């Protein structure tokens, strides 16, 4: 049972404890601890120590129990709150369709799940850091063991705070040194903590070894580059969101150049390390046989490891959600069943095809036809039959892949690719007016994709490149937040094929197809009608058991 992170007092140090999940870890790793019954605190004190380096690392690895459940859940906010994805997961009242239609509220499950697990991961990281500090002082762990464990804990804590502030704005900040779990902090405080943790991690962690499941010095540098880009684009304050909360108006874009310079600096540290590279084949970045740098090409920089539903805290359902019911599109005598997440309409494929028909990434990003390896039958995923399939969720890396991975959910989730580092550098340079300098990192991505290079990319080209390179990789709404174009980008659905009220008259549909595209139409209309300025933030949710967390709500909710 996970605890309400808000309903505890602060006495110098924040002393939250998890119960079942954490106590299981502590009972193995700690010299002094107790296993408590469900719902009772398990108090870690300054006297707790671990016995050795391996136990210290094991203690920190427990934080992943709060990251694994989020691997696919992030998509249900970050991708659904965009013009690219819709959800037919369960009834229309379920959390997936609710987010798809911009109808999320404080008790919408994905908001509850992500917010609470990120903070619970922070709690666990805080406790681990305290315990390992004690252990170093007691001579139980070596300096190398301390560096590896605390470096990882601070890396994961910083990543959690970055996700939280991107999605919820000013959030409470608390560490092993103290803080409040209910008092929201200004961005200077939040980003200051993120940067402190990441600079500590950079100094503590070892160089990238080729195993992206292990946080590295270069992974910390990449997150610093990401953080400075996000902060450099001046996230909207609560007051700024309140001013537009109930309107369909995007605020004016602004930036802070000094932070963008820091984004370039940290991107260059990754690039100049010589440890990372772009994979030669974009399509072989995704899938069980390609996960976590199995091909040794060093593009995967940081990943969340998964072994599957029965082995993880939760498997990675990115495949399951985009390819829930393989080949059930009504053709060849198969049933017609809707996946949990769907491409918003044919247009997400069509617009890309029209602009760059030879882009090698398109064929992997959206599938418009697939052959069933068991029957040899070809299935169409394009209207009037269906919408395109998010190809990065269809694991084709091994035999009969289309039918296997959805039951395993064991593919590691990619959090950072080297491609992101290159694009961060290119974007920061363009925002600073140094467009010609941006061409070199920008064109590396385009050369791999097999499309034309440019002498000086524009900001619009940078934005499109994020879509081309990172569709379905959990960047969509976060980029709209940075660029202050959330409302205008979502309202582009008005140009989509099945948005207009006369959509049915333009094609011939079977009954199943008509029912499917009726839902597509309804979701596109809802996106257009419902998106508001308040959606630059997610609602502060309840706790995992429905309790009030005591944190001030975001404007408009």
Language-model features: locations:
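C-terminal motif of bacterial Sec signal peptides marking the signal peptidase cleavage site
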Residues: 29-32
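Bacterial signal peptide processing site
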Residues: 34-37
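Conserved, well-structured interaction surfaces
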Residues: 52-71, 92-168, 178-192, 196-212, ...
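Elongated scaffold/linker segments in the mid-to-C-terminal portions of large proteins
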Residues: 53-55, 60, 64, 68-71, ...
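Short coil/turn linking the two alpha-helices of tandem helical-hairpin repeats
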Residues: 165-167, 172, 209, 230-239, ...
